[in-house]
Amino acid sequence: EEKYEHNFLLQYNDIAHEKHSKIELDTCIIGPQVWLFDTYGQFLIEHQDYYKKMIAPSQWVKDKFINKFNLPENKISVWPVGIETFNNERDITYDCLIYFKRREQKELDAVKQFLDSKNLTYKMVEYGGYGEDGFKDLVNQAKFCFLINGTESQGIAVQEIMSMGVPIIAWDIKEWLDQGEAYRVPATSIPYWDERCGEVFFNIDELDVTFSKFCATLDEYDPKAFIKDNLSFECSVKTLLDILR
């Protein structure tokens, strides 16, 4: 055994599994990059005495670990990674940035049609199809963001949008179904959120009313403050240190 006061395996893959066999088990913290459906995840489910804590990136993921994998609540802690608090000055050149990830094309088409009906200009980014610098430029130039997103265990890109001070109208979803009916659980595309971030709706029939409210109070949102208060590097480090202790 290698002797350390704390042992932290951020990602649990073949390399981490090998490392795991050489460290003190009673101080071992694992996650949040854990996939309980693979061989290494199954090992953690079957050997709960081999680690002190498993980390979930958000509350709904913790609930999934408990309710679908029968992991004890006292074994699971929630820790989101820190988000940079950008010191940007917004340079607005168009109305809406559409952020699209793992949703149906017809939902995207409905949003585009809605924005067209309001004579609003928009640009779109799709997950996996952008570079970091180009993404930040598009975010900084947008008056607001329209989020059409699948479930997120944390939602780092979304939180970077918030951190740049861009209000969001989010077409949220209520369940995680990625692994089929047996693992259906309540979930969300915005696991870190409060009223400072923007507005949320779940059904296309709610869009018109929600959007009217969003536009009427657009200048009152402060997503940058939400990130600073909840997901800054300082907040993230404090939470992690509390878990390690």
What positions do the PLM features span?
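C-terminal alpha-helical cap of glycosyltransferases
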Residues: 213, 229-245
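Short alpha-helical donor nucleotide-sugar binding micro-motif in glycosyltransferases
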Residues: 137-142
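Catalytic binding pocket for nucleotide-activated donors in carbohydrate/polymer assembly enzymes
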Residues: 153-230
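Extended catalytic core of nucleotide-activated donor transferases of GT-like folds
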Residues: 1-53, 60-64
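Conserved catalytic-core segment of nucleotide-activated headgroup transferases in glycan assembly
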Residues: 81-135
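A short hydrophobic beta-strand element within the catalytic core of glycosyltransferases
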Residues: 145-146
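Aromatic "clamp/platform" in nucleotide-sugar-dependent glycosyltransferases that forms part
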Residues: 150
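Donor nucleotide-sugar binding/catalytic pocket of nucleotide-sugar-dependent glycosyltransferases
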Residues: 52-63, 71-87
